[in-house]
Amino acid sequence: MRLTAELCCPGHRMPLAADDGTPEITLATRFLSCRLGCQIPVIAGIPRFVISDSYAASFGKQWKAFRRTQLDSFTGVAISRDRLTRCLGGSLDAVRNKSVLEVGCGAGRFTELLLSSGARVFASDLSSAVEANYDNCHGAPGYFICQADLHALPVYLGSFDVVVCLGVIQHTPEPEKTVAALCSFVKPDGLLVIDHYRYGPEDMTPIRQRIRRFLVGRSPRFSLGYVRFLVALLWPVHRLLWHFRSHSSVAAARRKWLSISPVLDYHDYYSQLGPRLLYAWAALDTHDALTDRYKHKRTVEEIRECLQDLGMEGIEARYGGNGVEARARKPLANVDANERINRSDLIETC
């Protein structure tokens, strides 16, 4: 994995080098350092700019447990490709030969698609999910990954053609600050692509809310085990009701069951996955829905207003996918401001 031109010491805004002086990070690399003496540990081939998963620990456990579940290359179904294509405006050509920052990369469902579409991808995640992403994507040309906090990301401001953050912002403490940070890494005339949960009928059911209150704050290991047991217990009912759904009485019973079951069920949306993968997706997304510490909701108008307040242009925001999907461009006028910040935002220690 090669060091990238965008990578820098987050404290001193200067280049980082591997301990052996080469431009490559390998499993033998112990740390990265800047010329002022900061050292960033490299563990299992991945630079670690944070020492813990913080509020994202459950996601780290989740993505390592379901490392390939949502990868199109594993499922053989273009669910992730369709979503990414739609969010990019209709074509993956938007990232070809572009530098792309992917924040909250998880296990790599979008990372692998960005790479296969010809992008140079700088992937990052706050959680240990980076290990699953590395397992799935390392070796691909143009791939770099690190574990880091968005608000202290080790890259120069205004240095990426495209910044992608999907399925993430709603899980951060302050979504508007998250969007502002994402915008800061977009080049002038570059593209920002985001999404966010919406208010609506898909909100948490009462039983899911109660279980979530019980699980949030517990150890990731306990929460994952609890959800796996819950899904194993209830999934046979989901399958049975789906199988006999053509009977009107069963269809009515199924609608009622789906309104009270804490298990997420994708039979109506992704039946092409087949029974085995539908079960895996149910376990994955039920865990995701019941263990996230933050679960914010926003309207299209709120997302659009946020982007406008940040000075973004060409804003397109609409309801779709997981909620609100939006993209916007940074105006060319921001080029000088980014340069000034990169030169002056220095501190004495990391």
Residue ranges, per PLM feature:
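Conserved N-terminal segment of class I S-adenosyl-L-methionine
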Residues: 1-157, 162, 295-296, 302, ...
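N-terminal cap/leader regions of alpha/beta-hydrolase-fold enzymes
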Residues: 26, 166, 179-182
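Glycine-rich, histidine-containing beta strand-loop boundary motifs that form or position
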Residues: 125, 147, 167, 196-198
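A short SAM/SAH-binding and catalytic strip from SAM-dependent methyltransferases
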Residues: 162-173
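A short glycine-rich, Lys/Arg-flanked "PGG" loop and its adjoining helix->strand segment in the class I
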Residues: 176-188
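Conserved class I S-adenosyl-L-methionine
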Residues: 191-225, 232
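Substrate-binding/catalytic lobe of Class I Rossmann-like enzymes that use SAM or dcSAM, i.e.
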Residues: 207, 219-308
